[in-house]
Amino acid sequence: MEPAPELLFYVNGRKVVEKQVDPETMLLPYLRKKLRLTGTKYGCGGGGCGACTVMISRYNRVTKKIRHYPVNACLTPICSLYGAAVTTVEGIGSTTTRLHPVQERIAKFHGTQCGFCTPGMVMSMYALLRNHPEPTLDQLADALGGNLCRCTGYRPIIEAYKTFCKTSDCCQNKENGFCCLDQGINGLPEVEEENQTRPNLFSEEEYLPLDPTQELIFPPELMTMAEKQPQRTRVFSGERMMWISPVTLKALLEAKSTYPQAPVVMGNTSVGPGVKFKGIFHPVIISPDSIEELNVVSHTHSGLTLGAGLSLAQVKDILADVVQKVPEENAQTYRALLKHLGTLAGSQIRNMASLGGHIISRHLDSDLNPLLAVGNCTLNVLSKEGERQIPLDEQFLSRCPEADLKPQEILASVHIPYSRKWEFVLAFRQAQRKQNALAIVNSGMRVFFGEGDGIIRELAISYGGVGPTIICAKNSCQKLIGRSWNEEMLDTACRLILDEVSLPGSAPGGKVEFKRTLIISFLFKFYLEVSQILKRMAPGLSPHLADKYESALQDLHARYSWSTLKDQDVDARQLSQDPIGHPVMHLSGVKHATGEAIYLDDMPAVDQELFMAFVTSPRAHAKIVSTDLLEALSLPGVVDIVTAEHLQDGNTFYTEKLLAADEVLCVGQLVCAVIAESEVQAKQAAKQVKIVYEDLEPVILSIEEAIEQKSFFEPERKLEYGNVDEAFKVVDQILEGEIHMGGQEHFYMETQSVLVVPKGEDQEMDVYASTQFPKYIQDMVAAVLKLPVNKVMCHVKRVGGAFGGKVFKASIMAAIAAFAANKHGRAVRCILERGEDMLITGGRHPYLGKYKAGFMNDGRIVALDVEHYSNGGCSLDESLLVIEMGLLKMENAYKFPNLRCRGWACRTNLPSNTAFRGFGFPQAGLITECCITEVAAKCGLSPEKVRAINFYKEIDQTPYKQEINAKNLTQCWNECLAKSSYFQRKVAVEKFNAENYWKQRGLAIIPFKYPRGLGSVAYGQAAALVHVYLDGSVLVTHGGIEMGQGVHTKMIQVVSRELKMPMSNVHLRGTSTETVPNTNASGGSVVADLNGLAVKDACQTLLKRLEPIINKNPQGTWKEWAQAAFDKSISLSATGYFRGYDSNIDWDKGEGHPFEYFVYGAACSEVEIDCLTGDHKTIRTDIVMDVGYSINPALDIGQVEGAFIQGMGLYTIEELHYSPQGILYSRGPNQYKIPAICDIPAELNVTFLPPSEKSNTLYSSKGLGESGVFMGCSVFFAIREAVCAARQARGLSAPWKLSSPLTPEKIRMACEDKFTKMIPRDKPGSYVPWNVPV
């Protein structure tokens, strides 16, 4: 085989020809680094987040059709693109040409915040529209199922793209003739108050129409190439790897014969992650290209034969067509496969992964192989020696040599037989998330009865996720042959299968008892569903099923359907150009949607730029015995390796060590940094650094271990109000309890990133970073380099999400990179991979709350004694502040007359946990709400009644003796009760629960009072700089960081109001310590407030200075006023400053005025749970908030919704797993699940109270970004109510030990029944668990 001279494909309509191709190159770095198309983003590198989505188009010479489909560029080898047309976000529209409607609508519907995920969203939707110009809502949800967003909560994205759907209208409540945006209470429109107008969040008449004729045409050259059907195998050779692309079946078999160990790669979704994450290397890869025999679709009298080269998306489409055409009795297996194909991965992976690759990979959690195994499927395999058939059975799945493919064979096709009359095939799965998540357990089950007799003739049951491969319960099934289909058979089957499909207590993946329960819960579902079918076919054969059991037959599907948004009215007397109070689009929204928004790693490489990669500790607590750098230093491209020894006394900054010196304190601690010419060279060399460790004791991982070892960061914090001990003596009842709450990964879409550029003179250094705290980077870099701070400047254009995770961690990276940059006089770039980021950086603090409550029988809590413990990790970071804020906010909406709360930050051997949105309140508030809920249960009262009876009075005092006016708390609560129709729906929920046994619903309403402030005047100061240029344009700079919350947009709104000029006249370049020095970190939802007051101050200074000129020419323009000022030597620049609110707290006295104001609200959520699987769906959520006067309702609603969904994830599905050795397992989207589009409430309603009072804040506004996280616990408590209802129906005590998150595992195991009692349980201490709680 001769090497191919060139690789030819198209990108955005432009021809690309590569003559020297490295087969190890993926499309993503090629687009970004080679073609400089940086709109396609790196999010995870494993196909799990969708940030790198592009569209690929190929011409099929057989069908004469062009296929458009989305793929993950991070997993797409560039060698696989021969003859393809690639379309990126830049190729469909731009601000300099024309916007595509897909780009325009997501921006105008306020569907972008940080914007990092937006290009991927845009391309997924674009690919859908190329195939379905008027998609259905189901197709829309399916298309976006592989795209993650951490900011928006998805609602505005769906609303934007619903406008393309067949059923799309801006509302779905048209019976009364009113738009959903104008719905009032009970569907009646609200009466507008005089002198007020309601601004629309978006305007439908402004949409650009979708015009398919304006799309990029498929390159004719590629059609001609495809029609010619080239016969020559293409071979691309790199330094380490050879890529072979046969174009005929004969050539493929020849290649496989020559290189029998080479994997056959179609979509690279299995081999690719193995190479990237497991270090598996393949010197030769065989990748067939458009071989017709591998794409066959053949119908025979016995069934359907599908080519192994078909993508899973194609298989899904084929099966959907087949089930419409063949009789239902013949389509059982096809329907079951379709069910799993709808949730398997995301659309991008399904379009890349092939049927054959999925089968051959034999992953233990494969969704299709259990079904194919029970369906009596056959594999047709080929080699040069000929063709043969292999049964897809247990032996094949367990890789028995005699039942497997030989090394020189390839899988050509799969035969899937028709099912028969009296034969039933069903599919089951349960995952942490409904879509785009690997199954915890899945199953395929098939039964065949004798003609009309109800006797089992054949039975096949397979499970995935419960062993090293797919497990077939062959022996159990054999013993059940000849049995009647009844409950006695079911009971026997459960016991047989539990014996045969045994899981050791230390099984990988953990959740052992849950998996055991799912094994037989699925079997029971199979029994019920088959019984129901038999009831329809032959009523006499079916065992009797109670009506209340029928709900078990339906899976939970909660597709988002609609929302209502009730923001505030704008005073009609407001100047028309005054944008304050209007839903102004995020000013980077369009740039987000076109890929033109520049993030740090989008910046072009600096001349002679170096790359930095870290070596991290694999031990939780160990002594560094020796470090051998010689082999790593000898590798090509390696320039240097930085260790703690090089940094000397600059290695410690405050409490943080930049690099480990003699001892490591956690897995993931930075030990040294490799500096090399390229990213690949740096990462390869990092693997060759040899470090010898000696383990040390103790290794403390959990809060309980820290308490036992008295391992705390000092000091203890304490607040006390009243006399707790005396109050306990006079109460009616006392209860004690505790709750453990797991941590949370920030999962910002843009990973930690830094670029340090030495300026070449005076030791000046420019640092570009994705950070919330540029001043801290400036200070740390200056300290490490022993320079005055004025030599170091830190610049931030925008940040692709942060949530508190980019306050301190980026500073360590920047300081080490700066040391190397300074030493070598060359720029140094460092971009963490997703797994590195999650391993190194820490997240939200896990919490343990212990409480003792004394209360009266009417629910009034008289005394409360609470202890808070947080898992701080191995260094202090912000752990003390998190404990302090948790204590100051722990009482939430309630006045406890006697309160004592104490808090400790635990020192453990985990990566240091840090700031996270909410800053202690999501944990502290949950502890209090759990206590309230338990009190209600003890009193026999409803939780909402006990909550209301303990509310703050209108004028009251907090435990730290700050005065409070809680009028809006009560108003939010009452409005939420009314708007959610709480009491009516509670009756409906009770009725539903009485009529259903295996499905239960829960309804919960939670209030909140979120204090806003930083507890210090110094932390609240802010500054700004405003320039007016002679053409009348304005440049504004301030100290806040744009990380998705829209602070730059709000600052321009402030300038527009104050200077009475259009927003289009105002520009903001970014944030820099060069223009605004000595800034505080951006966080705590105070960024717009504090910096806005500084901007306002600067504008007022300018206006005062220019007052004589403006008075002299009141009808003039800013251009005229600026020129006149210049002529009179009047400065057109002004700094603005805000000193911070008067806030303080004296911890010794336990009193002070730490907060400027309070944000009030309430959230009501309704859920439905599946008691057999632990699955849940959120049916509806209503949120009412007091936001003061909203500066920008669109941005503020986005903050509320995004925070709520993030909080919902925190309390339900986001789960971190650590090994007993302290190793974090959850290092990417495949292991750690944040909410996806499938998880949001089916109905979401957000209401802002009208502004009710003037305040000292910016235009009487309130910060909202943090408070909304806690509202997610309304879903948590709704799940609790549903579980309690299930337990009561089973005669169990309703209260049960709560912990967060309430995952499917915890929900299922709390719904105790005969199946949970049937499973074997391992004695604690008899095995080493796979994971441990921390």
Swiss-Prot record:
Cofactor binding: number and manner:
Binds 2 [2Fe-2S] clusters per subunit.
Task: List the catalytic activities from the record.
Answer: an aldehyde + O2 + H2O = a carboxylate + H2O2 + H(+); retinal + O2 + H2O = retinoate + H2O2 + H(+); all-trans-retinal + O2 + H2O = all-trans-retinoate + H2O2 + H(+)
- Residues found modified as Phosphoserine: 1064
Q: Which Gene3D superfamilies has this protein been placed in?
A: 3.10.20.30, 3.30.465.10, [2Fe-2S]-binding domain, Aldehyde oxidase/xanthine dehydrogenase, a/b hammerhead, Aldehyde oxidase/xanthine dehydrogenase, molybdopterin binding domain, CO dehydrogenase flavoprotein, C-terminal domain, Uridine Diphospho-n-acetylenolpyruvylglucosamine Reductase, domain 2
Top-level taxon: Eukaryota
| EC number of this enzyme | 1.2.3.1, 1.17.3.-
- What is the protein's name according to its record? Aldehyde oxidase 1
Organism the protein comes from: Oryctolagus cuniculus
Q: Which gene encodes it?
A: AOX1
